[in-house]
């Protein structure tokens, strides 16, 4: 179910404050965040945001095509290593 259009997109206040401060200073630095549920808004374009995947922070460069998506979509949490191999040979 999508978010109501009457509401604004969710962005964590702390993350929004950090981005606004960097935009007023015209600086670029990596912003570390745990807020995977935050929506990418146009003021974030051009910044690098390190998104937590449960183990480490993955730096993601925000482009204009990412606007409207959530930060968590770009930091995968699961690492599938393949199904276990069958050990039928060793059992014989």
Curated annotation (Swiss-Prot):
GO MF, one annotated term: rRNA binding
Main location group: plastid
Any one annotated GO CC term: mitochondrial small ribosomal subunit
GO biological process, one term: ribosomal small subunit assembly
Domain of life of the organism encoding this protein: Eukaryota
Keyword Membrane included in the entry's annotation: no
Keywords, in A-Z order: Chloroplast, Plastid, Ribonucleoprotein, Ribosomal protein, RNA-binding, rRNA-binding
Pfam families: Ribosomal_S19
Similarity comment: family membership: Belongs to the universal ribosomal protein uS19 family.
Function: Protein S19 forms a complex with S13 that binds strongly to the 16S ribosomal RNA.
HAMAP family the UniProt entry points to: Ribosomal_uS19
Protein name: Small ribosomal subunit protein uS19c
Species whose genome carries this gene: Daucus carota
């Amino acid at each position: 179910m999508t978010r109501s259009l009457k509401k604004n997109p969710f962005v964590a206040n702390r993350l929004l404050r950090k981005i606004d401060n960097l935009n007023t200073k015209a600086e670029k630095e990596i912003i570390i965040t745990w807020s995977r549920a935050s929506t990418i808004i146009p003021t974030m374009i051009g910044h690098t945001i390190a998104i937590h995947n449960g183990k480490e922070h993955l730096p993601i460069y925000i482009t204009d095509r990412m606007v409207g998506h959530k930060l968590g979509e770009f930091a995968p949490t699961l690492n599938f290593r393949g199904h276990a191999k069958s050990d039928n040979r060793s059992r014989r």
